[in-house]
Amino acid sequence: MNRAAFRQALRIVFPGVILGLLGYGTYAYCYILCWNLYHHMGYRAGLALLIVYCILKTLVFIYWAAVVIVGPGKVTGVSPLQIFIPGSEVVDEKAQAIVSRQINPKLPDTYICDGWGMPKWCSECQTHKPDRTHHSAIVGHCVPKMDHMCFWVGTVIGQHNYKIFLQYTTLFSTYLIYTLVTTAVFTPRMGQYRRDRGAPDSIPNGNIIALLILTGAWAAFCTSVCLQSFWGVCRNLTAMEGLGRKQGDMVLVNFRYEGKRIIQPLREEDPLPFDQGFAKNWRQVFGTNPLIWFLPFPVVPAAEDYFSNAYGQKFLERIPARWLEGDGREMAAV
């Protein structure tokens, strides 16, 4: 099995494992805990616990489905950037080579580039890759503002479903914490009930023990993913960008300065390129309507905005200052 086929298989296996564990957890919580509390012990709270559990679990499935159905998005309709002005070439007749040409002044003021200062190019999709775009072999196309591939969900997380993914992880964490806390609170009462009925010990049912272990470990993992994702929203930093910074990946930026195009590597001490402050970062992901913040609807920019990712003001002030300090080079017009 090649790597691509293996990854496609994981897209099915991991969600299948999740569904299996959720099914077992539902049996342990709803029947072993809630039903016994209500039917055998006379606790009306058992019925209330069951209703809240079912509501939370239904919401988890709705938002999970929305993440997969909406998908990460696809880069389409990106017009090729005209790097140089047509007809501006100066040709060396002897060498039969272009010695200079005029750079198009209509290029975006700032963009992530390759070593030549050109916008990133995807050989698979045969298109320019706007800032924050990555090609995903899993979905077979370029994904705008790609965050990561979540095998537990079964799809890639990108610009279109990123907000819904955050809502999903929040709901899933809430569901798991609710299950863990209520199980821990009512399990001793079941033990007391056993003792009152003459049982030699108050050891809880094995399914309850398994439920506590599974929900505890799972809640810790899911909550950490949720908090990390929201921290990324606050800083306008995707998971892939954060990983690249930790690994020291070379990232080049091309920007306009006094009529020149400057190529400069990003430095670890630089401000985050897309960080515009908490309020703007939040609205970029969740939108401006507070009602939409809680509903599973994507916030999608227009296609023509692919090359208009707003850079943070601190970053835009820092890169020309570094150029004046001698860091960077001018883009060659050949």
Swiss-Prot record:
Task: Enumerate the transmembrane spans.
Answer: 12-32, 50-70, 164-184, 207-227
**What InterPro entries does the record point to?**
Palmitoyltrfase_DHHC, PFA4/ZDH16/20/ERF2-like
Membrane topology field: Multi-pass membrane protein
This protein's record includes keyword Lyase: no
Domain DHHC: residue ranges? 120-170
Report whether Acyltransferase shows up as a keyword of the record. Answer: yes
Q: What GO terms describe the biological role, i.e. biological process, of this protein?
A: protein targeting to membrane
PTM note says: Autopalmitoylated.
Q: Which GO terms describe its molecular function?
A: protein-cysteine S-palmitoyltransferase activity
**What reaction does this catalyse?**
L-cysteinyl-[protein] + hexadecanoyl-CoA = S-hexadecanoyl-L-cysteinyl-[protein] + CoA
Q: Which GO terms describe its cellular component?
A: endoplasmic reticulum; Golgi apparatus; membrane
Broadest EC class assigned to this enzyme: transferase
Alphabetically sorted, this entry's keywords are: Acyltransferase, Lipoprotein, Membrane, Palmitate, Transferase, Transmembrane, Transmembrane helix
Cite the domain annotation text.
The DHHC domain is required for palmitoyltransferase activity.
Q: Which family does it belong to?
A: Belongs to the DHHC palmitoyltransferase family. PFA5 subfamily.
The protein here is known as Palmitoyltransferase PFA5
Q: Which organism is it from?
A: Yarrowia lipolytica (strain CLIB 122 / E 150)
